Regions:
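Conserved catalytic-core segment of NTP-binding enzymes
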Residues: 120, 125-167
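Short, conserved glycine- and acidic-residue-centered signature motifs
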Residues: 25, 100-103, 153, 157
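Hydrophobic/aromatic beta-strand patches that form the interior of the parallel beta-sheet core
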Residues: 10, 85-87, 144
Length: 167
């Protein structure tokens, strides 16, 4: 994800699930694309990915195919009808829920090697502060935490921000 030359890498996180993180990520990606920017959205929720559903597209391959070595990162990318390039995460695959630091680092390196010329890479994180979320957020030049107006969402967002600023 070290596309520092021209690509802005934006991480969208939350302390708690169900606060609208994917909705914010998808809408940001589509809005930037509509403004004429070249945008890629990475669904980095390793076990419950659903950005492809929000974008209304079918993805024959996902991140699990890349991590297994079956496909390259470039081979799993799909272009949505909105023009956004999507790196689909995996959903319902148990091994993806326990991704290790080494695999997260491999994903970050794979993004750096992509030839795609993009202006914005939006990274839709899983909820919480897992090692994968922290690794992906560390690779982002801009970080946003989505929060709802309920006490547990606010408390979890605050805890997430505290952990993120320690990195």
């Amino acid at each position: 994800m070290d596309k520092a030359k021209t690509t802005q890498v934006i991480g969208i996180a939350s302390g708690k699930g169900g606060v609208g993180k994917t909705t914010v990520s998808v809408n940001l990606a589509v809005a930037l694309q509509a403004m004429g920017h070249r945008v890629m959205l990475f669904d980095a929720d390793m076990s419950l990915a659903n950005a492809q559903i929000a974008l209304g597209c079918r993805c024959p391959y996902n991140l699990s195919h890349f991590l297994s070595g079956e496909k390259t990162l470039a081979e799993i990318i799909v272009t949505t009808r909105q023009g956004v390039k999507l790196v689909p995460g995996a959903s319902g695959i148990q091994e993806m829920a326990a991704l290790g630091d080494i695999q997260a680092s491999n994903i970050v390196r794979a993004f750096s090697a992509l030839d795609d010329d993009i202006d914005f890479l939006i990274v839709d994180m899983a909820a919480g502060i897992s090692p994968e979320v922290l690794a992906f957020m560390a690779a982002c030049s801009r970080r946003f935490v989505v929060v709802r107006d309920d006490p547990s969402s606010i408390a979890d967002a605050y805890a997430t921000i505290k952990v993120l600023i320690q990195d």
